[in-house]
Amino acid sequence: MQLHKIIFRYIICLTFGAAIITGLKLITSSIALWTKRSGQVMSGIYNFSDYAKYPLSIYNKATPIKYMLLFIIPFGLIMTLPTQYIIFGFCDIFPNVYILIVTICAMSLLFNFIGVKLFNLGLYCYESSGN
């Protein structure tokens, strides 16, 4: 495969991966509108990203952690799989790279939509924590 196509697809994955991270931050930060504190939730979610530093193939197919890293808190989807694609030229979970790209794009739209809706709902419940 031509190198410029691989790099272009990788840049698309990185761009929409950044959008997923933005949506995830918006979701976890919006919790503070109700609770006044969201630091523990945010750090818990981002500590979960340590599991995505390793290839997803080390996790058994039956483990829920693999699917959580792909679809619930998709750090594996945006960290491991695009890198695996650029290094090896294929991805073991998604047989076609276009399915991977469409999944990343759809997840970024979903997470940002949920984040914006949660933020707007939180604005109705917001009370200042000032003195």
Regions found by a protein language model. Give the residues of each.
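Transmembrane helix-loop junctions in multipass membrane proteins, especially transporters and channels
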Residues: 1-3, 30-38, 89-92, 119-124, ...
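Alpha-helical transmembrane segments and their short interhelical loops
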Residues: 1-30, 34-35, 94-105, 110-112
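Aromatic-enriched hydrophobic runs in primary sequence
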Residues: 3-5, 18, 51, 82, ...
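Phenylalanine-focused residue identity feature
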Residues: 8, 16, 48, 71, ...
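Transmembrane helix segments
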Residues: 21, 25-85
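Short amphipathic alpha-helical patches
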Residues: 51-58, 92, 109, 129
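Extracellular/periplasmic helix-loop-helix junctions in multi-pass membrane proteins
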Residues: 80-102
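Junction motif at the cytosolic side of a transmembrane helix
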Residues: 105-131
